[in-house]
Amino acid sequence: MFGRLGAPEIILILVVIILLFGAKKLPDMARSLGKSARILKSEAKAMKSEGQESTPAGPPNTDEQPPAQRTIQAAPGDVTSSRPVSEPTDTTKR
C-alpha cells in the first residue's frame, strides 16, 4: 500500500499536515512523539529484562518480604518529576 507513494504524494501529505497543524505546533508534536517513543522503548526493555531475570515458579517462600519499590524516572527534558511505584504482588485472595 505504501510502496506506491512517490515524491509528489509525499510532498502533498506533508503540505496537508503543515496546513492542518501549523508550522508552530509541528516541533512540539515531534518532541512529544519522540518522548513517547523513548518511554515506550525503555519500558519494553525493562519488561524484557524482568522476564529474563525471573526464575521458574518453585515452592512458595514462607518468609515473604514486601516487594522493593521501583522509581520511574522522567525522560531527559521532561517537566514531570520521578515518583516511586510499588510492584504488583502475585498473591490473590482465595
Swiss-Prot record:
One of its GO terms (cellular component) is TAT protein transport complex. InterPro entries: TatA/B/E, TatA/E. The Tat system comprises two distinct complexes: a TatABC complex, containing multiple copies of TatA, TatB and TatC subunits, and a separate TatA complex, containing only TatA subunits. Substrates initially bind to the TatABC complex, which probably triggers association of the separate TatA complex to form the active translocon. Keywords: Cell membrane, Membrane, Protein transport, Translocation, Transmembrane, Transmembrane helix, Transport. The chain crosses the membrane at residues 1-21. Belongs to the TatA/E family. GO terms for molecular function: protein transmembrane transporter activity. It is found in: Cell membrane. Residues 62-72 have a biased composition (Polar residues). It comes from the Bacteria. The keyword Cell membrane applies. Part of the twin-arginine translocation (Tat) system that transports large folded proteins containing a characteristic twin-arginine motif in their signal peptide across membranes. TatA could form the protein-conducting channel of the Tat system. It is a single-pass membrane protein. The keyword Lipoprotein does not apply. Gene3D superfamilies: 1.20.5.3310. This is Sec-independent protein translocase protein TatA. HAMAP family: TatA_E. Residues 44-94 are annotated as: Disordered. GO terms for biological process: protein transport by the Tat complex.
